[in-house]
Amino acid sequence: LSKKSIIEDLDHSLLTLGTDYIDVLYTHWQTTDKKLYPIEETMDALMTLKKQGKIRAIGASNVTEEDIREYCQYGQLDVIQEKYSIVTRKVEKELLPVCKELGVSIQAYSPLEQGLLTGKFTMDTTFPNGDVRNNNPSFQPETRKKVLDILEDWKKYLEKYECSYSNLVIALTSQMIDGLHILGGARKP
């Protein structure tokens, strides 16, 4: 998006929300065509909005190490948002080092691995056609079996700490990276 478009879109959103600012503005799914949507122009818009007090923090979601470095060339990238759980941990090797180096926080999305870590699924659980979990490597039989075995072993902790699998998994995940933020997004209680 162009600088003008980013600023106009945020102004419209603020009006719709009835507020003067938002805490974090994330860019999502970074473009592969950096000439069409250069990070420099995006950061110029975001830094302008931050200076105006319309956003408090700048975030980018689903990024590479190169993206993070480029964002930081043009201003302060405050936080990245990435898929991260006790099953999906590529952030630790691929992005954590550069985030530590550049002072960028990490927010984890899908910490319950699309429900797999809630204890609600079995090896016999199937999903409707078109459900993204059908293609998620974590839900494939070999990995699902390993996860279910771990959850079975953790049953003793549910009673000991009087909590659910979700509570336990989120607590564990929050301790895996110093300062990690967890984004919850359950569809059902």
Labelled PLM ranges:
Residues 1-3, 28-29:
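Structural motif corresponding to the early beta-alpha repeats
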Residues 2-17, 64-70:
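Short, acidic/polar
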Residues 9, 25, 171-172:
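Generic alpha-helical secondary-structure signal
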Residues 14-33:
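Active-site groove signature of glycoside hydrolases
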Residues 30-189:
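Beta/alpha (TIM)-barrel catalytic core signal, keyed to glycine-rich beta->alpha loops juxtaposed to Asp/Glu
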